[in-house]
Amino acid sequence: MAKGQSLQDPFLNALRRERVPVSVYLVNGIKLQGTIESFDQFVVLLRNTVSQMVYKHAISTVVPARNVRVGPGGGYVQSNEGNQAEDDDVEQ
């Protein structure tokens, strides 16, 4: 698995498992809302009134509606609607 996906997959999986509502901002500025139904290496299946397959390369930001615990010992990802989500425990 690529190093860039070591946080991405657990984050998306936690959102999917807990059915957390998300706002997905695309690189063209469009905002999509729903819950993550499924995902793979290239796409995210976003569910609202319909299911939408969104290519990951088109996604800029994923903002959860509430805090989400990522991974077994991971920190919380906080929701800042309108701002990019932040992870408390990320070390620089």
Curated annotation (Swiss-Prot):
Function: RNA chaperone that binds small regulatory RNA (sRNAs) and mRNAs to facilitate mRNA translational regulation in response to envelope stress, environmental stress and changes in metabolite concentrations. Also binds with high specificity to tRNAs.
One GO cellular component, as annotated: cytosol
UniProt cross-references to HAMAP family, sorted A to Z: Hfq
Presence of the UniProt keyword RNA-binding in the record: yes
Oligomeric and partner information: Homohexamer.
Keyword field contains Ion transport: no
Gene behind the chain: hfq
GO biological process: regulation of DNA-templated transcription; regulation of RNA stability; regulation of translation, ncRNA-mediated
Annotated family: Belongs to the Hfq family.
Keywords on record: RNA-binding, Stress response
Domain annotation Sm: ranges: 9-68
Pfam families for the chain: Hfq (PF17209)
Stated name of the protein: RNA-binding protein Hfq
Location of region: Disordered: 73-92
Domain of life: Bacteria
GO molecular function: RNA binding
